[in-house]
C-alpha cells in the first residue's frame, strides 16, 4: 500500500511544475493570422490543418446576389 501511495505522490509535483507558467494571450496580429485555431493546442496535426485552411476561408468571396 505504501509503495502505491509514493508513486502517486511522485507524479503530482511534475504536473504542478508544468501548470504555474502563465499563458500569454495571443496578440491581435496572431489572432488575425490564425483566428480560432489558436485555441487548438492538443493535436498539432489538427492545429496545422486549421492554420492552413484559415486563409482560404478568408479569401473566399461569395458571389453578390
Swiss-Prot record:
Residues 11-21 have a biased composition (Basic and acidic residues). The keyword Iron does not apply. InterPro entries: Poxvirus_F8 (IPR008726). Residues 1-10 have a biased composition (Basic residues). The keyword Lyase does not apply. Residues 1-29 are annotated as: Disordered. Pfam families: Orthopox_F8 (PF05886). It comes from the Viruses. Keywords: Early protein. Induction: Expressed in the early phase of the viral replicative cycle. Signal peptide: none annotated. Belongs to the orthopoxvirus OPG052 family. This is Protein OPG052. It comes from Vaccinia virus (strain Copenhagen). The lineage of its organism: Viruses, Varidnaviria, Bamfordvirae, Nucleocytoviricota, Pokkesviricetes.
